[in-house]
Amino acid sequence: YVSSLDDDGMTLPTGTVTYRQNSAESNYHGQHVGGTVAGQHYGWAREANIYNLAVTDNFASGQFISAYLIYDYLRAFHLYKVVNPTTGRRNPTITNHSYGGVFYFNSDREALPFSELNSVVYRGTTYNSGNPGPSGWTQSGVETDFGVRFNITSGPSQSAAISADVQDAIDDGVVIIGAAGNDNLVIADPSDSDWNNSINWNYDGSARSRYYMRGAWPNSPDNDSIIVGALNNTHTFTRATFTNYGPSIDVFAPGRRILSCYGNTGASDSKYSAGSGNYYNTANGTSMASPQVAGVIATLATAKYRFTNSDAKGYLQRHSKDNDMTFDSGTGSHSDNTCQKGSPNKYLISKNSRSTSGMIEDVKGERKTSGMTFPRRSTLNYQH
């Protein structure tokens, strides 16, 4: 395990990462995500050097590497890369984080029943059965007025300590791009009045409380990570019904019915390597949206000697598609899946998109395993 990485930035990292065998059935989450980032047939950055860090055991059975070590490892990986002889610099490090911290409402991992809700603190005011919101103290009323969800078994868990580790990695030059989460909750800005919104409920006779609009580590708004929400797969360009949203989202990207490589189930590969045992399947989630951004950013970074998290944010700010999403076509309340609530009207776009004929673009060639040079010509051709 990575147990001896130094935090002083002076000594080389020591320790190793070990992986234990696990016979549990996988849902191929990481494989699908990696295929979107850099897969040869369905990915963006087809010539990227790929490195995998197993953050969890078999998804989602639990933490594998301590969250407090993940970002130390990324910092060490980035800071002590071998200098590229072509550029005289270390290559940029673009990372995707399609995972997030969660809390469960109870040990049975069941959805929170409305009957167990004691109160909601919303923008500094406490609401309860004696002081209801405008829509009344009912489940639908609380959802409409305050954006609390009762159909989910868990909520996003933000950690200031982990967020500080993420920021350290960003400050050291690592680009961190991550999924917003799939709770259909607002992710507030730390400076606004929704940051301290909390829910208070009972379980087994004890009172419990959680902030519910702070997002989840590592992609929370109290660090500079790039937070990606999911775009629906309709021509109206609405946000996906499951995605977290709000003022702390940086950009939306396709996240519904995304086709990528899979395990040993799904659609067998009959186009490129029939009989090879390769399979592809579709998946939904902000986990599928985030690697779209990471892949495009990695492709862009191939033309840069230096590429930081700030550079990536700047690119997304300047070159995403603006004001083309459909928001607030319904009531505009928290219970309306089209509500904007401060979300950016902005989604990922590549100016030099894939072929317009055929389902996908044919592979350009096999990825090299040695002799990689940097930088390579970017496949993006954006206009200033």
Model-identified regions with their sequence ranges:
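Intrinsically disordered, low-complexity boundary segments flanking structured domains
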Residues: G35-Y42, R210-W217, H334-S335
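Extracellular S/T/G-rich loop segment that most often corresponds to the catalytic His/Ser-adjacent loop
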Residues: Y1-V2, D6, V174, W201-T302
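C-terminal subdomain of the subtilisin-like protease fold in secreted/lumenal serine endopeptidases
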Residues: N52, V82-Y99, F103-D108, S225-I227, ...
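Subtilisin-like serine protease catalytic core
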Residues: Y1-L69, V83-I94, F103-D108, D171-G173, ...
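Residue-level detector of functionally special positions within alpha-helical transmembrane segments
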Residues: G30, E47, A54, G181, ...
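N-terminal domain-start motif of subtilase-like serine proteases
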Residues: T11-N27, H78, S157-A161, Q167, ...
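Substrate-binding/access-modulating region of protease and related hydrolase catalytic domains
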Residues: T56-S220, A274-P291, S329
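Hydrolase catalytic cores
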Residues: G34-V37, Y51-N58, T95, G255-H334
